[in-house]
Regions:
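N-terminal Rossmann NAD(P)H-binding glycine-rich loop of SDR-like oxidoreductase domains
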Residues: 5-26
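Conserved S-adenosyl-L-methionine
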Residues: 23-32, 119
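Conserved glycine-rich Rossmann-like NAD(P)H-binding loop of the short-chain dehydrogenase/reductase
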Residues: 28-45
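Conserved residues in the N-terminal Rossmann fold of short-chain dehydrogenase/reductase
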Residues: 37, 61-62, 102
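Adenine-nucleotide cofactor-binding loop residues
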Residues: 41, 66, 88
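Short, conserved SAM-binding/catalytic segment
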Residues: 46-55
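Conserved Rossmann-fold cofactor-binding substructure of NAD(P)-dependent oxidoreductases
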Residues: 59-80
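Conserved Rossmann-fold NAD(P)-dependent oxidoreductase catalytic core, especially the SDR/UDP-sugar
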Residues: 80-83, 87-147, 151-153
Length: 154
């Protein structure tokens, strides 16, 4: 599925992103594996962990899912997008509601818009159990994010 494909991972430097990248590199031969993240320190650490000498497919793209133009640029020529970017710490979300809303909801909307604009074949968006019956802002934003992706699929 991922052999000889261009894959972009939003939030690629996070816990899921790191494990996903490692799995892809061990099981497939992607043409390009692009890490899209706003954390340049973690990108630098990943570049050391997944050295370009050994993994020629690795690319790093500093950006934020809240920035539609940057996201659209990053998705040019991409076949698959794995959307893992999120503000996910429940307590942080409660004290920074607009950051959570802008990242989790606005970011999801931007991923859909950019993917459609760039003719991406498939987008896989991560969710959480907290979206099934939300009792906090994080869960509510992830439920809304899920609805955005479902709606875009119709």
């Amino acid at each position: 599925m991922f052999n000889n494909k261009n894959i972009l991972v939003t939030g690629g430097t996070g816990s899921f992103g790191n494990l996903f990248v490692e799995t892809i590199l061990n099981k497939f031969k992607p043409k390009k594996l692009i890490i899209f993240s706003r954390d340049e320190l973690k990108q630098s650490q990943m570049a050391q962990k997944f050295s370009s000498d050994k993994y020629k497919c690795m690319r790093y793209f500093v950006g934020d899912v809240r920035d539609l133009d940057r996201l659209t640029l990053a998705m040019q020529g991409v076949d698959y997008v794995i959307h893992a970017a999120a503000l996910k710490q429940v307590n942080i979300a409660e004290y920074n509601p607009m950051e959570c809303i802008n990242t989790n909801i606005g970011g999801a909307e931007n991923v859909v818009k950019a993917a459609l604009s760039a003719n991406v074949l498939k987008v896989i968006a991560l969710s959480t159990d907290k979206a099934s019956d939300p009792i906090n802002l994080y869960g509510a934003t992830k439920l809304t994010s899920d609805k955005i992706f479902i709606s875009a699929n119709n």
